């Protein structure tokens, strides 16, 4: 979507029904996009400001800067200090937070519909006008180091991080979002501020709002807030969705962290599909049947029939040009060989035999329910339209997505299984294994 857009132009992305579910987009000067979805039966609104920059975009000298910056933007602006930022929203019964992902960062708030002006003003102030002072950098450095320490104490988190590192090597998409102790200690104020001013531009930003709102009012509020910050200028031309990124080459291998844990944690998997691959719906059904719930093959075989683990599931992650398909299990260290054999056997059986009609039906049902039930509140609706506007060329309606799920055929599932599940495997393990050799698992 690289064509020039007329400043202030408004497009209806989805017509909705009976005044509900109407999704509209306005493009402002500088390429800032405002997307809203009407939910007239609720009394709340969710506001998100999405910036198309994530940990994947970091150069080696910036590792951890995206997440560091997310913290710093809440420390203060010329008009609000950290206490005033949080109190402005919490004092009206709302919530405010942010998160950093591999390919984007989001700042969001949820408030009563009557308090929409406050939420927009505070978030815009945070995103456009952070001071990023030396004092704040040093103060927040300690907070982030504590966050890394907390994360490192949870092996179920670390094993997923180790899997990504083994899968993608030392490329940016394989690095931890938080950075490392070493990289955080090396990041200085000047480097972070330069990163902020380079990437936090209107053409990379989407403001998404869902709830009991009028699109015109939202556009007016956003325009006023961004103009006050001097952040609206230039042609209304926004950055197109990314189609690739640095360092997404897949590797095969084993990564073992020897730790004296009571439970072993493992992820066995490979690369998945990109978020625009049409086969993603078939892979979603396959994933649901293989390890998506208590009725899935892996859960039944590993936990229900053999009692080898408490937690066992499969998952998919999708990025611009690659993805992940993984199987996670937490088990007693003495049971890991049995668990890995079951995982390999079930993957091989799916490739050789496909899924039964009953499994396909349950997999589709799980995907349908997960989609629809996940859109019952303003926050999830805001996230859906904001993320879709930032990373896709189009916004598929819920009915369109449901139709794509229902249209998945057994042959399509078989074809995607033969592709994805036959790719070179990668294994990450955390547990008391010393120099135990797991290389046979990935051959």
What are the language-model segments listed below?
Residues 60, 73-157, 189, 195-201:
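Active-site-adjacent, His/Asp/Glu-enriched structural segments that form or flank metal-binding
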Residues 2-6, 151-203, 222, 374-407:
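Scaffold signal of the M16-like zinc-metallopeptidase fold and its non-catalytic homologs
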Residues 76-79, 110-143, 313, 317-374, ...:
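M16/insulysin-pitrilysin zinc metalloprotease superfamily fold
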Residues 1-15, 206-208, 368-443:
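C-terminal regions of mature proteins
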Residues 267-272, 290-333:
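A structural supersecondary motif
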Residues 41, 46-110, 292-308, 319:
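M16/MPP (pitrilysin/insulinase) zinc-metallopeptidase core fold and M16-derived inactive scaffolds
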Residues 2-19, 24, 167-169, 173-182, ...:
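An aromatic/glycine/proline-enriched structural segment found at the starts
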Residues 145-159, 245, 257, 304-305, ...:
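Short acidic/His-enriched helical or mixed secondary-structure segments at domain edges of catalytic enzymes
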């Amino acid at each position: 979507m690289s064509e020039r857009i007329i400043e202030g132009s408004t497009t209806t992305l989805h017509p909705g029904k009976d005044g509900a579910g109407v999704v509209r987009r306005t493009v402002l000067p500088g390429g800032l996009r405002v997307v809203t979805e009407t939910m007239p039966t609720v009394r709340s609104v969710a506001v998100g400001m999405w910036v198309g920059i994530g940990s994947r975009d970091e150069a080696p000298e910036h590792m951890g800067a995206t997440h560091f910056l997310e913290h710093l933007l809440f420390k203060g602006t010329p008009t609000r200090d950290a206490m005033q930022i949080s109190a402005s929203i919490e004092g009206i019964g709302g919530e405010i937070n942010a998160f950093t992902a591999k390919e984007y960062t989001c700042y969001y708030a949820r408030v009563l519909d009557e308090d929409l002006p406050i939420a927009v003003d505070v978030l815009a102030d945070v995103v456009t006008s952070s001071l990023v002072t030396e004092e704040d950098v040093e103060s927040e450095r300690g907070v982030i180091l504590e966050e890394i320490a907390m994360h490192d104490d949870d092996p179920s988190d670390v094993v997923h991080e180790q899997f990504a590192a083994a899968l993608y090597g030392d490329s940016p998409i394989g690095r931890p979002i938080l950075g490392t102790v070493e990289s955080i200690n090396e990041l200085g104020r000047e480097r972070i501020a330069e990163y902020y001013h380079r990437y936090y531009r209107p053409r990379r930003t989407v403001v998404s709002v869902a709830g009991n709102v009028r699109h015109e009012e939202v556009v007016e509020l956003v325009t006023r807030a961004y103009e006050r910050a001097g952040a609206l200028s230039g042609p209304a031309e926004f950055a197109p969705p990314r189609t690739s990124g640095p360092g997404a080459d897949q590797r095969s291998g084993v990564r073992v962290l020897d730790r004296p844990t009571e439970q072993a944690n493992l992820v066995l998997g490979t690369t998945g599909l990109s978020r625009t691959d049409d086969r993603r719906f078939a892979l979603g059904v396959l994933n649901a049947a293989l390890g998506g719930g208590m009725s899935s093959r892996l859960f039944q075989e590993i936990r229900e029939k053999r009692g080898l683990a408490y937690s066992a599931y499969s998952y998919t992650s999708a990025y611009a040009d690659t993805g992940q398909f993984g199987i996670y299990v937490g088990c007693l260290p003495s049971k890991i060989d049995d668990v890995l054999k079951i995982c390999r056997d079930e993957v091989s059986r799916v490739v050789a035999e496909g899924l039964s009609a009953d499994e396909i039906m349950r997999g589709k049902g799980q995907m349908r329910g997960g989609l629809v039930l996940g859109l019952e509140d303003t926050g999830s609706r805001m996230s859906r339209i904001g993320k879709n506007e930032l990373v896709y060329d189009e916004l598929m309606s819920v009915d369109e997505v449901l139709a794509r799920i229902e249209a998945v055929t057994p042959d399509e599932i078989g074809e995607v299984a033969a592709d994805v599940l036959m790719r070179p495997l990668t294994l990450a393990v955390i547990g008391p294994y010393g120099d135990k050799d797991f290389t046979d698992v990935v051959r």
